[in-house]
Structures are given as C-alpha cells and as structure tokens.
C-alpha cells in the first residue's frame, strides 16, 4: 500500500486523468500531470540518496511544486514533513534534529531568509532549492529534470507516511506521525457536506496544517475535486478575488478569516453568495460569527473539530443545524467517549475529557515515548479537550481541560471571559490567563487586542465582564495589547501574556 498511489495511481487516473486537480494563479494542473510530477519527484529523491522511512522536510509555499514534492516523498516511501513558513530558526533547527531529516527541500525565498542555515545544510549535502536558483546550492528543478519516474514504494498501511509538527503554547514543536492508512480516510467532511466529484473547493488554511493539508489537497484529490491553491497567506482581498474568479462550491477557513471578511463593505462579499458550503475550524466558532456571516452572505457557517493527532475531522456540524452553540456530531467511523477525572463517563450534560478513536489517527509522537503512552491508549487518543454531550447527541466544546482554573474556590473556564469580551465591537480578540496576585492567590487577567482605540476596547471589555459574569468569574486585571502573541501555528502563547503582567506587577512592588 502507498498513500500517494491511492490518490493518483492507475485506478484513480482511469476515472479522472484529464480533470483539473489544482489551480494556482494562472497554472492549471490535471490529475494525470500531477501524477507524473509526483513520480518524477519521487525519482529525484531516490536518486539523491533518500531511502524509505527517512524524513524529507519541505519548506515551500503552497504551490503545485510543493504538492508534487510532498506526495513524491510519500510515493518514494519516505516520510514527508511540511514546515510552517513562519517557524523561528530555533524551531527549524529543533525539527531538523528531532526528525533526523535526510533532506530539506526549501523554496529559494525561504532559503535566502536563512543564509547561515542554508549554508550549513549545503555543506552537509542535505538541501535542494526549489523555486528559483540559489548559487552554490543544488537545484530541485535540476534534480527533477534529470530524474526518472519512480514506481510507488509498497510501504504497508501502518508504515509512517508523513509527520505534522504541531507547536503547543509552550515548548518545542512535536512530531505527530501518521501512516499510509490515513489516506484511506480523508474526505469525510466532503461527504457530509455533499461535495461532488468535479466541484471546486478553496481552503485558506496553509498546507502544512492538518486542516489545510486534508481539505486543500488530499481530500479533493481523493474525491476527484479541483482545489484552488494560494501560494501565500491569503489576506481578505485575495480570498475575495479567488472566490470571485473560481466560484468554489465550498470554502474552508478559520473563524479569524471570516471575521476579517466581515470587516469589508458588504458589496465586496457578493462573490460568497455563490458558495454552497462555508466551513470553519482551528479555533472556536461563536454564535455571533455564525449569525453575522448568515446576515452578510446568506450562508451557513459549519464547524469542524479535529486535531493534528487525528488528522481528519472527528466532529462536524450537520448542514442546516448550525447556530454556533454546538460543535456537532461525530463523523461516520469515528468513536467518541467522555471521561471524568476518575475515567468514568460523566452524566449527560456534564463536561468530560474527549477520547477519540479515529481510523486515521496518529501512531504517536516522535521521540516522546512517555507523552505517547499518556495520550494514546488502547487505540484511543486523549484530546485533553472538555466537551458536553446534549440530549440530541450533539457535542459542545467547553475548552481545554488543562486550562480549567479554580478561582475563589470555584471552577472557571477562561474561554467564558474571552467570549464575553469578544461580544464588544471594539475588541478584535481576547485571551484570559491566571496570574498570582500579591496575596499569593490565583486571579484572572484578561488581555484584549483592540479594533481601534485601545482604551475604548479596555472599557468595553471590563464593562461587559461586569455586566454579564458573576463576581468570581470577573478579571482582576484587564490590559490592552497590540496583538495576542501566537506560535507559528497560530495558538495563543498565554504564558507570554502572564509574564507581561507579572513584570508590570513586579515593578509596582
């Protein structure tokens, strides 16, 4: 078995060889052409010493060249590792060491931004430059020109095929290992949303994210759709332009992008009225955003919940049921259970930690045996997310179990404060963290990023908390920041906010 062969092998091409697989700027790549580029990419890797099971890192923009190289690594039996283009050099070096990468394929624009690291990898014979040429380093396109097509490597369903490096809010990125078996299970959300072969989809999420990789590349290929690929992180103008030009049947994005689009004048959002399905994942989808989007474009925002560890989604909002108050229901083939602190199923309506059994889930974390044993048990994965299941069988996300705080003897979920602050038009985004006060007690601090004037956002957030929250849930401190600090994968770095306030408080002592 080989995951790339499942998507682009003879059986798949017999049905759709001439159909367009990828659209990127002016380039249109058919399924047959993409399959040929994948075979050639695999041949180039094998010709330059990459062996089955070895890691190939790819630091490239989202282009057909990247898609062919990533799938080519899988085709060759290597392990494809797409890297976040916003990685710090320290995290890049960590992944290089952690993965023991045999080769790094780097687009020239990223190589030029890291001259020292590029020179080191060139001396070690572990780099090829994609895109344009870079003097003194091997050219990926020259390798492709000289390579022969390679046959797919029969790797077995449980053999490693790709890894996702997911950074938490603290610590270094960790490698999440997925097998060739995962390719059999992509596209579950597409089926739930009744997307049909030949339709066009557009995902704004980058291909190095699990969400973007499945819904922007692998699932469209598995189901015979055309995917619109944007090379760079798309801003609102680009998203609107691509929707107008390509008229996708479905848009896959994140709540932050939908919120930014809503800041545009309403006439500019007209292209979205032709889109049939709007999907959001990666962060919480609020009832307010669901309603605002419905009012603006007449479309229903549907929620997806999944993790890098499951790769594919686990929970989805069924069409015509979205109001933003419920996450959704499990996709076919996915098993879910809730557990309290003692490992027992909580009563209906009570929160519990979500455990997942998904046919596409990871085998574990690279070089982290203890964490693998802790979170992967007997075929189940512990998400560490809190959920409630209602009487109708819908799951409702309650936040992270490791973010639940006890304040004045009562449990508080920081998300509650963040949601209240986000109701205010002056607040662009908010994050709540615990901070120890002068009496040694843990209290809540709320940080807000303003849409306009910071003091207006501060006043609005504080007033909303005073008005809508019981006393024990109100923040002791409310502070404004230019933007919430985030990791390269977009997660809020709460510890940096806590340190910011701790420094302020220490100066006042």
Annotate the PLM regions:
Residues 329-333, 342-375, 410-412:
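Conserved ATP/PPi-binding loop(s) of AMP-dependent carboxylate-activating enzymes
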Residues 184-203, 208-250, 264:
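Conserved AMP-binding/adenylation subdomain of ANL enzymes
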């Amino acid at each position: 078995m080989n995951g790339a062969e499942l998507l682009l092998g003879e059986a798949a091409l017999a049905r759709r060889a001439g159909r367009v697989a990828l659209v990127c700027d002016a380039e249109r790549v058919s399924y047959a052409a993409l399959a040929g580029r994948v075979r050639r990419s695999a041949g180039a890797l094998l010709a330059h010493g990459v062996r089955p099971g070895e890691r190939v890192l790819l630091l490239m923009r989202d282009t057909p060249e990247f898609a062919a190289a990533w799938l080519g690594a899988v085709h060759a039996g290597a392990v494809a590792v797409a890297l976040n283009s916003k990685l710090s050099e320290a995290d890049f070096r960590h992944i290089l060491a952690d993965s023991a990468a045999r080769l790094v394929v780097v687009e020239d624009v990223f190589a030029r931004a890291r001259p020292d690291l590029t020179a080191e990898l060139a001396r070690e014979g572990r780099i090829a430059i994609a895109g344009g040429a870079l003097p003194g380093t091997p050219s990926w396109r020259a390798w492709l020109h000289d390579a022969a097509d390679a046959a797919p490597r029969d790797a077995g369903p449980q053999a490693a095929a790709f890894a996702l490096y997911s950074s938490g809010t603290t610590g270094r990125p960790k490698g999440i290992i997925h097998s060739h078996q995962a390719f059999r299970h992509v596209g579950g959300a597409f089926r739930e949303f009744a997307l049909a072969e030949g339709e066009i989809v557009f995902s704004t999420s980058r291909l190095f994210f699990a969400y973007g990789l499945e819904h922007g590349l692998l699932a469209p290929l598995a189901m015979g759709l055309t995917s619109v690929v944007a090379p760079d992180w798309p801003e609102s103008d680009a998203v609107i332009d691509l929707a107008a030009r390509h008229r996708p049947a479905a848009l896959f994005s994140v709540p932050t992008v939908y919120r930014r689009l809503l800041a545009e004048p309403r006439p500019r959002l007209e292209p979205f009225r032709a889109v049939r399905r709007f999907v959001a994942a990666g962060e919480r989808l609020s009832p307010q955003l669901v309603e605002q989007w419905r009012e603006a474009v007449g479309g229903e925002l549907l929620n997806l919940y999944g993790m890098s560890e499951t790769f594919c989604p686990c929970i989805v909002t069924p069409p015509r049921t979205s109001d933003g108050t419920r996450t959704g229901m499990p996709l076919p083939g996915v098993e879910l259970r809730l557990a309290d602190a003692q490992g027992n199923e909580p009563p209906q309506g009570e929160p519990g930690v979500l455990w997942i059994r998904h046919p596409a889930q990871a085998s574990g974390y690279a070089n982290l045996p203890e964490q693998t044993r802790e979170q992967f048990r007997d075929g189940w994965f512990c998400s560490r997310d809190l959920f409630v299941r209602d009487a109708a069988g819908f799951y409702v996300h309650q936040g992270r179990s490791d973010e639940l705080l006890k304040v004045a003897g009562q449990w508080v979920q920081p998300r509650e404060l963040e949601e209240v602050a986000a109701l205010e038009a002056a607040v662009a985004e908010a994050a709540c963290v615990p901070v120890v006060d002068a009496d040694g007690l843990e209290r809540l601090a709320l940080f807000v990023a303003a849409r306009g004037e910071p003091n207006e956002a501060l006043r609005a957030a504080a007033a909303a908390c005073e008005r809508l929250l019981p006393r024990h849930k109100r923040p002791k401190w409310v502070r404004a920041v230019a933007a919430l600090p985030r990791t390269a994968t977009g997660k809020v770095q709460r510890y940096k906010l806590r340190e910011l306030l701790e420094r302020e408080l220490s100066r006042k002592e």
